[in-house]
Amino acid sequence: MCGIAGQVGRDPRTIQRRYAAYCAMQQTLARRGPDQRGMYICGAAALIHARLAVVDLENGLQPMQLDWQGETYVLVYNGELYNTPELRAALVARGHSFNGHSDTEVLLHAFAEWGANCVPRCNGIFAFAVWQQNAGTLFLARDRCGVKPLFYTQAEDSLIFGSELKTLLAHPAVPPRVDANGLAEVLLLGPGRTPGCGVFQNVRELLPGQYACLLYTSPSPRDS
């Protein structure tokens, strides 16, 4: 079990001044990823990871970066792929090479090769985010069964996401405010909740099998 989080916005200055917030968000993920922590802050994007190291301890560090065909891809990922060998073989046939044997690296190359079409190719449980540095786009995806959680909200003219609700609430731009719908979720459905509901005001959950492409601040969720 790992944890991911991040913020991507229109104005790089917003991202650059929020380092303390990112450290606080990362701290909320400590129980999910006690072994290693990583952070990527560049331009209008910040990606955060807390890792439970299971496979390829040296070469599986995140955020993981790949330069491929003129684009720079940065990945944070929580999950496990069950068809890693098959994906790796298909990617090697297309000219990709690998530094290690982690499924993280395979997923990153898969996105670089197939984009959003990599999601239906992945057999596993996952939630991940990929930042395309040159294109200025963020991609979020979640597995079909929704085993791995992923929440998001819009604030500061940006998108803020994380593996847990408390991760988002650690950001000062996300107030812990529960509206009428959220209160109904807690009182009538708790400890369960409606799929997609984040309980807190303006907080949503990416649905199982859904992905979202974000250019600047216009997220467009789609079902895979």
Model regions and ranges:
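Cysteine-centered catalytic environments shared across enzyme families
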Residues: 1-218
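A short, hydrophobic C-terminal helix/tail in secreted or cell-surface proteins
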Residues: 219-224
